Every structure is written in C-alpha cells, then in structure tokens.
Amino acid sequence: MRSDMIKKGDHQAPARSLLHATGALKQPTDMNKPFVAICNSYIDIVPGHVHLRELADIAKEAIREAGAIPFEFNTIGVDDGIAMGHIGMRYSLPSREIIADAAETVINAHWFDGVFYIPNCDKITPGMLLAAVRTNVPAIFCSGGPMKAGLSAQGKALTLSSMFEAVGAFKEGTISKEAFLDMEQNACPTCGSCAGMFTANSMNCLMEVLGLALPYNGTALAVSDQRREMIRQAAFRLVENIKNDIKPRDIITQDAIDDAFALDMAMGGSTNTVLHTLAIANEAGIDYDLERINEIAKKTPYLSKIAPSSSYSMHDVHEAGGVPAIINELMKKDGTLHPDRLTVTGKTLRENNEGKNIKNFDVIHPLENPYDKQGGLSVLFGNLAPKGAVIKVGGVDPSIKVFTGKAICFNSHDEAVEAIDNHTVREGHVVVIRYEGPKGGPGMPEMLAPTSSIVGRGLGKDVALITDGRFSGATRGIAVGHISPEAASGGPIGLIRDGDKITIDLINRTLNVNQSEEELYRRKNQLEPFRAKVKTGYLARYTSLVTSANTGGIMQVPENLI
C-alpha cells in the first residue's frame, strides 16, 4: 500500500506514535488497512458547503465499514455570489489553484492510499479535480448537491440568477420594493449549490460523464436522503478502487474530456466549464485544441434548457431522469460519446447509464426534438480572438444569429457597471470590458453584474458584451467571454476604440472588429505596456504566473526557470 511509506518499518515508529495520537486507529490491525483522505470543503459562509461536515461524517463511517481508515482534511472555498462585484471576485478563480495545491500537499505529504473528495461550489470542484489528476491516487467525488429552487409570493420559480436580474429591474423601477425583498428572502431556500445550471452544478454534472462520480451526483438535492446514500455508496466504491488500483488518469483521457464537453453542450452548461475542463486536460497531459469544442458542438444536440435559460431547476432535471437520462439519450446518436470508457464504478459509461430513460420530455428533450441540433456553447475566433473566445449560445435569444454594434469601451468591470446603470450604454452598443482576464484582473472576475443589469433593463437582445474576463453560470444574453489573448498579454481586445464596429457571428463562430490588420498594428505600437494592479500577496504571485483563458487560466512557471 502507498501508506506503508509512513507506517511500516522500525524507522517509522515515531510516525506510528503520532498516528496513534490522532485517535483514528481503533484496533491493532488498523495500521494494516488503507488510509483514505477525505478532502472536504466545509465552510460556514458558503450555502453550498454548510452541510458538508455532516456528509463527511457519513463518508467516514462508510469508509470504516468498508475496511479502511478515514482521515479528514479541509480546503478553502469562495462563494462567487457573495464575492461578486468587489475585490473578493479577484480571488475566486485563483482559489482554484490554492485548493489544488493544498490538496496535493496533504495527499503527498501523508501518502494516502485513496481520496474521497467532497466539493460543491464553483472553483472547489475543479480545484479538487486538478489535485486528483495531479496526484493520481485512487479517488472518487461526491458533491454536496444542489439546493431547491425558490418560489416567489406570486408562485414564480426563483434561482440566484433571478435575484441578480431583479437588481437591474428594481433600478429601472419595473418591480416593486416588496417584490424585490420577497425575491431576496426566497431565492435560495435551502443549503446546496445554486439551483440552476450555473458553474457549480455544471461541473458536478460533468463529473458523472467524466467518470469520477456516481450517477446523479450533479442533480440529487443537497437535502435529500439520496444524497446521503450516495455518499455511502461512493465510499464503498472508493475502497474497492483502492484494491483494484483504479486511478484518475485511467479515467481522465481525451475521450473523457470530449464527452465532458458533449454533455456540457447538451445541457447548455456554464462557460466556466470550458476554462476548468481545459485546465484539467492540461493537468492530465492532454494537448486539447479549442477547435475540438466546436466540432463537438456541431454533432451534439441541445437537450435540456435549465435556469437561467429557462425556469427549470436542477431538481426538475433530476425528476426528469437526471444526467443518466441525458447520457443515455446521447448514446443513441453514434459518435456523440465514447460510452465504453472506464469509470469509478468499475463499469463503463454505457453500463452506468444505459436504459436510464427520460421521465419528463418538457425538461429533457429527446434526440428527435432538441432545443437545437447543435450544442449550447460555442468557441469564437477572429481578429479580436485569435486564440478563441467563448459564448453560451443557449443563453442567447434564438432570434439572434449575428449581432453588429458600436464598441463602448471600459478598462474595468466597475466602470462598465456604472455606465450601464446611468444609461450611457444604449441599444446597439457592444460593451467592451478588458483588462479583466486572469493576469489583468487579476483573477478573471465574473461579469455577472453588468450582464444582469443589461438583461434587467430589457436590453438582452439589443446590447452585447465582450470581455477577457469570464461570466457566472447565471449569465445570459449576448455575452462573449474568455477572449484570448487577454488585454494584459497584448491581446487585440486592448486595441478596440469607442465607435469601432464589432460583429459577433454565431453561425460562423467568429468575433471581429472592422479594422484592418495595419490599423490594429498601428494601435498596438501606441499601447501603454500593462502594469500589474496588485503588487503584494497571493494575487501578485498569481499575476506573474497565470496564462490566458485558452489554456484554462493555469499557472505556469516560465521555461527559463525550469
């Protein structure tokens, strides 16, 4: 066993003394059992994580029952909804790297035989997944699960995105103070990740198709008995996988990455999943070309439109058959998935999901009646995005195929929000928000406030927004993010000027400004060099090492230092 490194031999008597002091070893034979880390992310201020201590206790009990010894440790967590709109959002994406590094540190320092990961919200799941692939120790994931959808006094289904859009509507005077406060009190009624197809739930659904989580991981409610039983079954499965030496890199292959994007397309997942999945591919040593995403989109139908793109919540998806029903439907179309891949169940993706039929055709559409014949995400290329940009086409009004408008430029999120709120932004504008990428932000903050204000003011079809920053999974509208290279790295988004005509072509998947190559070159020579906004602390170190979104926003040590 891997853990023999710290518990076998006379020279490890001091280590054994310390292990006895933990109280985790109940019997003399326990030293001969596998040591299993529980990588938890319990934190009081994040509603998606307040219940994870209880879930970890269930996992501990089941791991012991299965014949192994559990040791729990914790990671940090950031709630993107609470961190939104201020310096806290600068720390959200960078927290992914801290989580990955912290988990790697504990796992490798103590030679665990397996790891039970309990994530839930936005950056925690991908951070833990980066650690799982990096350490390549037998692992399984079981998230905390989504919260129930809220309900307004008028009986309208609510999610957190409803609340963000209500801010814009309230500023416009289109909803009353009473209705506004009612929504605030009822949008998030239970613990769990936010109820729509936002980043947390997108990633937790993708864990199923990647093969590192059990079926229904992405949709079973946080407060359900099914979630607690899933924790138990995942613990039993992990101990079996330790015995059989099934490791993350046996499961995370290029085919698995392709299938993750296919499910993302079918469910209209968050654009952040592109960022995280590219980072995971990089960690697994897979050189993944962004162009593959468009190829996958072309052959993957859009089957389930979930909040914020509809009123359906994750619980509605669960009741309609969950991710297994969507996977089963996609498997009926040859070439869409790679169903004979290994998963943590010890079975193939096909064996896990075959025969799991759709129970509600309003929530999950069948192959013969998709929302769209192509997937809900697109990667755009052009003279504004030589290395790509991402748009959630599933969140764009279906009538919009091409949008051309005049640029109105802002060098920060806050400047843009102020201009939208004071009506400087008008119909026909393309709002350009730059210097908000991984390096420029720093931290690639989410642009949920400006997009929500645009939609809340009723301009969702009349104003577009492009940025080298990113979006919340709750974003909808004509919103193009992840533009690469970012402005801070000399990308052409930094060369746009007010009044330039910008065209977003969803049919041809292009993003262009109507300026010649010569003019853009002239502007680049006049550009002031980027200077880091933060000079001290973690964000300063992050700025010096992070790359643009087309790589997944990973941190790379310069080649001359390796």
Curated annotation (Swiss-Prot):
Cofactor: [2Fe-2S] cluster; Mg(2+)
PROSITE patterns assigned: ILVD_EDD_1, ILVD_EDD_2
Active site: S472 (proton acceptor)
The organism of origin for this protein: Staphylococcus epidermidis (strain ATCC 35984 / DSM 28319 / BCRC 17069 / CCUG 31568 / BM 3577 / RP62A)
GO biological process, alphabetically ordered: isoleucine biosynthetic process; L-valine biosynthetic process
Binding site for [2Fe-2S] cluster: C121, C194
Coiled coil: none
A cellular component annotation (GO) from this entry: cytosol
GO MF annotation, one: 2 iron, 2 sulfur cluster binding
Catalytic activity of the protein: (2R)-2,3-dihydroxy-3-methylbutanoate = 3-methyl-2-oxobutanoate + H2O; (2R,3R)-2,3-dihydroxy-3-methylpentanoate = (S)-3-methyl-2-oxopentanoate + H2O
Pathway participation: Amino-acid biosynthesis; L-isoleucine biosynthesis; L-isoleucine from 2-oxobutanoate: step 3/4; Amino-acid biosynthesis; L-valine biosynthesis; L-valine from pyruvate: step 3/4
N6-carboxylysine: residues carrying this PTM: K123
Protein's recorded name: Dihydroxy-acid dehydratase
Alphabetized UniProt keyword annotations: 2Fe-2S, Amino-acid biosynthesis, Branched-chain amino acid biosynthesis, Iron, Iron-sulfur, Lyase, Magnesium, Metal-binding
High-level lineage: Bacteria, Bacillati, Bacillota, Bacilli, Bacillales
InterPro entries hit by this protein: Dihydro-acid_dehy_C, DihydroxyA_deHydtase, DiOHA_6PGluconate_deHydtase_CS, ILV_EDD_C, ILV_EDD_N, IlvD/EDD_N
Record note on cofactor: Binds 1 [2Fe-2S] cluster per subunit. This cluster acts as a Lewis acid cofactor.
Statement: the UniProt record of this protein carries the keyword Hydrolase: no
Family, as annotated: Belongs to the IlvD/Edd family.
EC number: 4.2.1.9
Subunit field text: Homodimer.
Gene: ilvD
Residues that coordinate or bind Mg(2+): D80, D122, K123, E446
Function per UniProt: Functions in the biosynthesis of branched-chain amino acids. Catalyzes the dehydration of (2R,3R)-2,3-dihydroxy-3-methylpentanoate (2,3-dihydroxy-3-methylvalerate) into 2-oxo-3-methylpentanoate (2-oxo-3-methylvalerate) and of (2R)-2,3-dihydroxy-3-methylbutanoate (2,3-dihydroxyisovalerate) into 2-oxo-3-methylbutanoate (2-oxoisovalerate), the penultimate precursor to L-isoleucine and L-valine, respectively.
HAMAP family given in the database record: IlvD
Pfam families per UniProt: ILV_EDD_C, ILVD_EDD_N
